[in-house]
Design a protein with these regions (language model features):
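Condensing-enzyme catalytic core mediating Claisen C-C bond formation in acyl metabolism
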Residues: 3-60, 158-222, 227-230, 263-280, ...
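Conserved beta-ketoacyl condensing-enzyme motif
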Residues: 25, 59-118, 234-249
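Short active-site-adjacent structural elements
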Residues: 34, 199, 247-249, 319-324
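Acidic, glycine-rich active-site loops and adjacent beta-strand->loop/helix elements
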Residues: 91-96, 118-119, 144-150, 196-198, ...
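Short glycine/threonine-rich loop-to-helix capping motif typified by GTGT followed
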Residues: 101-104, 243-258, 323-331
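Active-site-proximal alpha-helical scaffold in enzymes
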Residues: 115-142, 181, 286-308
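Active-site pocket-lining segment
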Residues: 241-282
Length: 345
């Protein structure tokens, strides 16, 4: 009789995974543009480039270079070489993910291309953690990027048009962040993930993405708390990706209706990265690079030094395309959650 196959399940609740053995962030790095360097977190980033074209001829080529550089720095900080990376999970905002194709493609590593809009860093980090936890790779990378000029060209208006932006609009971050996830013990570990659902409340205003994404953020956060049997105060911080000032208040109101008070522990990468009073960024920052660079150069170091013991990282995405928008469709949202902890916790 064939021996019955047995496995230890790591599934938890309805949408979560609790890793039987934690995986670790071995190295992380970020590269940003001039505007991001002038913001409150400017001194945290690894590289601040004064030239938003990064020495290239086009904005798109600049974004390619950002991904290459952030990936290279993350590998170097992990004391590895690119040949040690088993696979890369990469994504961006451009059509057919060309920044990842041309940027990461030049590194010669196996790649999975992803699209989760501005939630892509959460998606890529969750998948990298699952791959390492399952034994599919010892060192796996998660990397994403965005660029203000490429996003404006792709989704909004030509830069020379000079359109008036509403106060609910966000500012796409020029930046790329990368993390090397490994089985080797380091100071920051990933202990679980919660996979988000697509939530569509029928909102159609692409200039108010925070409102479009807030219900998805609420859905994922609530499910994480239920699956892990936790309350918001069990996290030092619950940090969303790019809800901005508008989306943050909506999220907190929605969580209150679900019975969770999270105002004391909630932060948002889109709020942290810019000073809206002096930088004219309205609701805050957005883009795949927003949560990625804040994670790589601010959140992870805060956990590594012990300032924070446990953080719920929840990047958020507005799942629209220029075609769906022009056809009058709504803007669905999604949020992916990753539980980050100090290794001694």
């Amino acid at each position: 009789m064939a021996e019955k196959y047995c496995r230890v399940t790591q599934m938890l609740g309805k949408q979560s995974i609790s890793f039987a053995n934690p995986v670790y962030i071995q190295g992380s790095a970020s590269i940003v543009g001039k505007k991001e360097g002038e913001g409150p977190l400017g001194h945290h980033f690894d590289v601040v480039e004064e030239d938003d074209k990064f020495g290239q001829k086009t904005w798109e080529e600049a974004e390619n270079v950002m991904q290459q550089k952030s990936a290279g720095m993350a590998v170097e900080k992990a004391n590895l070489q690119m040949k040690d990376i088993r696979m890369i999970f990469a994504g961006d905002l451009l059509a057919q993910s060309t920044a990842s194709s041309f940027g990461i493609g030049a590194l010669g590593c196996p790649v999975y291309g992803l699209f989760g809009a501005c939630s892509t860093m959460g998606e890529s980090l969750a998948l990298a953690a699952m791959a390492v936890a399952a034994g599919y790779g010892e060192n796996v990378m998660a990397v994403t990027s965005s660029h203000f000029a490429t996003a404006e060209k792709e989704f909004r208006f030509p830069l020379g048009y000079g359109n008036q932006r509403p106060l609910s609009a966000s500012w796409t971050v020029t930046g790329s962040g990368a993390c090397v996830v490994s089985a080797k013990v380091s100071r920051v570990k990933i202990t679980g993930v919660t996979t988000g659902k697509i939530i569509d409340d029928g909102l159609k205003d692409s200039q108010n993405m925070g409102a479009c994404m807030a219900p998805a953020a609420c859905s994922t956060i609530v499910q994480n708390l239920k699956d892990f049997g936790r309350n918001p105060d069990d996290y030092d911080k619950i940090i969303t990706g790019d809800l901005g000032y508008v989306g943050q208040q909506i999220l907190l109101d929605l969580l209150e209706k679900e019975g969770y008070a999270a105002a004391k522990v909630h932060q948002d990468c889109g709020i942290l990265i810019y000073d809206r009073e002096t930088q004219d960024t309205h609701s805050g920052g957005s883009g795949c690079g927003c949560s990625a660079v804040v994670l790589a150069s601010y959140i992870i170091p805060k956990i590594a030094c012990g300032d924070w013991k446990r953080v719920l990282f929840v990047p958020t995405g507005a799942l629209m395309s220029k075609v769906s928008f022009y056809e009058g469709n709504s803007v669905p949202g999604i949020a992916q959650a990753v539980v980050l902890e100090n290794a001694e916790n």
